[in-house]
Amino acid sequence: MADSKSISPTDITDCFFHNLRAQVRPGDRLTVALSGGVDSVVLLHLLTTFSESMQLEVSAVHVEHGISTYSGEWSAFCQSLCDSLAIPLSIHRLKIRRRPQESLEAIAREARYQIFKHIQADYVMLAQHQDDQVETLILQLLRGAGVKGLSAMPTVRLLEPGKTIRLFRPLLNIPRSEILNYARLHGLSWVTDESNLDTSYDRNFLRHQILPLLEQRSPAYRKTLFRSTQHLGEAAHLLDELAEIDAENTLVTNRLSLQGLRKLEPARARNLLRYLLAQRLIRLPNSTKLEEILRQLNNIQPDNHFRFIVDTLEIRCHRGLIEFLPADSLPEPIAPVVWQGEQHLVIESLQGVLKFTRQNNMGIDPARLSGQIVTIRSRSGGERFQPDCKRPRRSLKKILQEAALAPWVRNTLPLLFCEDQLVWVAGIGIDCNFQISEGSTGLVVAWHPSQINQVSTH
């Protein structure tokens, strides 16, 4: 884009429209993260300029962190602004508490993003601009970040895995000075956060103490450093493409082959692991922790179990295959649940659904269950099972081990009991004593993990 000194408000409008049109489509729902500061006020003003012609559904969200004594006034300002523009606004009030070794800025950002995840929108619009991007680059340099971190903030990214809502920063290539010019030209009002002057925060110290000196020596530093973030973004994209190639060669049914990972050169192994973690949108580990994960993976025996927690993710390895599982969603063994003939039985503690259907020549003999108490529960130990009538009854533990199921899967498989007799084991089969005779209609049970929200009970 042109040098910031030559940009007029009209050019800013054109630049914003270009950024917007390149990403959104008619009918998209856009929610502005509105703090009340000049950046987000200008973003909302620009967006309302084009919302009707582009057929966009615009709303706003304000998060009151409760950190400043003025936070209530800022909420009232945002409400008044949105009322004047006929823009729906949702206000969320929080109490932010400091955590050891974490900045207040990072804690507040995490809290905001948790709220954003529940917004009914296609995009959450953020008002970060070119100066913010340059500051982020310098702060990342001071932290010793790699290529991914030095590419700073992406213009667009998914907010969380498996969802469609995205974060969008349409002002990222526009300097702060021109945003201020636009606000003054259009007579906009905004609030000022007094904490922006507190130089105990690294970003504020950089903004007020360091960058003015840098500008004296290199007036165009914003433009040149912003260009560096773009170059680094391209390099990060190429590293992601390399990781995708390595992933294709090392992934086995969505699990990472330990042997395949070990065959890679150390730099490529680090790149692949970093990429797979980033795909799950967690806070990436620093280089020391990443090296420790790889060291342990390189030293364990293929038959050994491995567990390592990174942010909200748990890395587990079993029989040479590495899985990435949400640490807070690993199910616990369940208490007995009585089945009363439902077609769908939700097992919330196991995060899945049992589906019961009738089919010819297969399944459980319904007559064996008639008049009996049928329950679903997890293993308690000592169960014996005979899914193959040509083989003797054996311990369920041994059968599950032979099926190469990971220990954390074995302990949370749903089992169907008729009174005290084990009838069916998910993924294994039906006990001989309960299998349907040929020519009859049987009850087929199927286990569908992670489908709680996809079915209704009958």
Curated annotation (Swiss-Prot):
It comes from the Bacteria. Its EC number is 6.3.4.19. InterPro entries: Lysidine-tRNA-synth_C (IPR012796), Rossmann-like_a/b/a_fold (IPR014729), TilS/TtcA_N (IPR011063), tRNA_Ile_lys_synt (IPR012094), tRNA_Ile_lys_synt_N (IPR012795), tRNA_Ile_lys_synt_subst-bd (IPR015262). It is found in: Cytoplasm. The keyword Nucleotide-binding applies. GO terms for biological process: tRNA modification. It catalyses: cytidine(34) in tRNA(Ile2) + L-lysine + ATP = lysidine(34) in tRNA(Ile2) + AMP + diphosphate + H(+). The N-terminal region contains the highly conserved SGGXDS motif, predicted to be a P-loop motif involved in ATP binding. Belongs to the tRNA(Ile)-lysidine synthase family. This is tRNA(Ile)-lysidine synthase. The gene is tilS.
